[in-house]
């Protein structure tokens, strides 16, 4: 499904997407929204723990084991700016390997991943960063856009601090309601929303 969206609508769409927590009720098909220059791709919709969720006794989890449904991925969003050939990931989920392949159509994020935005420190939103470390991909200075509190958490706690020390990621602070211009036709405005906030 393809629709034309304005910059304002993109901001609203991102805000809504980032504020929603989904459980077993998920869409069955990939959804993509695009304009001529900027497209948004939903790369995952499942809650932090994946599918089936550990300890889940809901029908959807039980059916997953017994019927072998196709893999559903943890929440993530991809943004592509075709005018500048730039690609951004919202969240670094445990499924980051597959999600980057879906977004970039390549399994090498250093070739064309221009940044990762993290919304908060729940495991399904940042645990995929581990794949950027030296035990796996050993990336080079992938821009990581975070609120100051999240940046402090990453730079002060292992194993995340190693990503910063080894320059696998490069921290970039973003601020509530302050526009982050990525290109002349694309910017993101982070919005704080009520949500559990352990870190």
What are these regions (language model features)?
Residues 2-12:
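Bacterial N-terminal signal peptides that target proteins for export
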Residues 20-23:
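C-terminal motif of bacterial Sec signal peptides marking the signal peptidase cleavage site
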Residues 26-199:
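Binuclear metal-dependent hydrolase catalytic cores
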């Amino acid at each position: 499904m393809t629709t034309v969206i304005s910059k304002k609508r993109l901001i609203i769409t991102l805000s809504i997407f980032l504020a929603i927590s989904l459980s077993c009720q998920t869409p069955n098909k990939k959804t993509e929204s695009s304009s001529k220059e900027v497209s948004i791709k939903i790369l995952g919709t499942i809650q932090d723990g994946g599918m089936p969720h550990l300890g889940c006794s809901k029908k959807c989890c039980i059916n997953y084991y017994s019927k072998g449904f196709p893999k559903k991925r943890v929440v993530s969003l991809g943004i592509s700016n075709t005018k500048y050939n730039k690609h951004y990931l919202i969240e670094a989920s445990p499924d980051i390997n597959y999600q980057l392949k879906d977004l970039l159509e390549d399994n090498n994020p250093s070739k064309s991943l221009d940044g990762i935005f993290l919304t908060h420190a729940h495991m399904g939103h940042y645990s995929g960063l581990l794949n950027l470390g030296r035990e796996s991909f050993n990336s080079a200075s992938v821009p990581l856009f975070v609120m100051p509190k999240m940046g402090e958490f990453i730079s002060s706690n292992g194993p995340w601090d190693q990503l910063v020390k080894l320059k696998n990621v490069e921290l970039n602070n973003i601020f509530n309601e302050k526009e982050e211009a990525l290109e002349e036709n694309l910017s993101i405005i982070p919005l704080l929303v009520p949500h559990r906030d352990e870190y």
